[in-house]
Amino acid sequence: MSSSTVEEVEVRGRLRKRRADAGSVRLSERDGQLLRLIGEQYAITVDQLARLIGRTPRTGRWLRDRWRRAGWVESRQLTAAGPSFLWLTRAGTRVAGSPFRTWRPNAALASHIEAVTEVRLLSEQHGLGLWVCERALAKSLCFATPVRAHLPDAVIATGDGRIAVEVELTLKSRARLEALLLELGRDYDRVWYFAVPSLVPRLRELAAALPWQNIAVHPYPPRAAALIA
């Protein structure tokens, strides 16, 4: 076989391989990290994705669309006036190596999920500690004890101990709030409670009456200055 014929065969082979790969999306290390984080949070908004990668909302939408073409995520609004969320498909859960079950969209939880992720973004932006998501806490506790304790929305592990993170967007009964604060204050070194402004006075009053003074109530949305001080 002449050298020119060999070259033609090699070129045709490369073209066939290129056509076979055309349109496919390859998983990068960064893709895997971001997809696993989405699995930890149940879902995130497209705007939150953009901030995670330090890019514009347009780039966040581009990345979301890339993952959607690959079949790794689904994305849509979960409430009529709310933002677009994205969450892992079964294929996305598999390629990311996420240890959690594939989440089924739940409009009733959308605002709370978004709010918890806002706190996580702020915590990680300022290096406040290692974020342990609610899903990981549930996995560890189900093996540790037969008694189901209240799970905070997350725990931030620091050199000084564990900080329970709780986000409250809706009104609960006084008895329920008091029970939550009592349990969290007892079980964790510190508690950061983020609540919509209308709930802050009641929560601060309840926290002040507890036997331990390790609960800080912050208005939501979270502000870095209040946490770093």
Task: Please give the residue ranges for each predicted region.
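Nuclease-adjacent, charged terminal/linker segments that flank catalytic cores
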Residues: M1-W103
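Short, solvent-exposed loop/turn segments at secondary-structure junctions
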Residues: Q41-I44, L137-K139, T170, L199
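Structural motif
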Residues: Y42, G71, G127, Y188-D189
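Hydrophobic, Leu/Ile/Phe/Ala-enriched alpha-helical segments that form helix-helix packing faces
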Residues: R64, R68, V119-G127, L184, ...
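Active-site metal-binding core of divalent-cation-utilizing nuclease and nuclease-like domains
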Residues: R76-Q77, A108-S111, R120-E124, L128-R176
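A short, highly charged nucleic-acid-interacting micro-segment common to nuclease
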Residues: F100-V116
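Catalytic cores of nucleic-acid endonucleases
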Residues: R162, L169-N214
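Charged, structured surface patches that assemble and position nucleic-acid processing machinery
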Residues: A209-A229
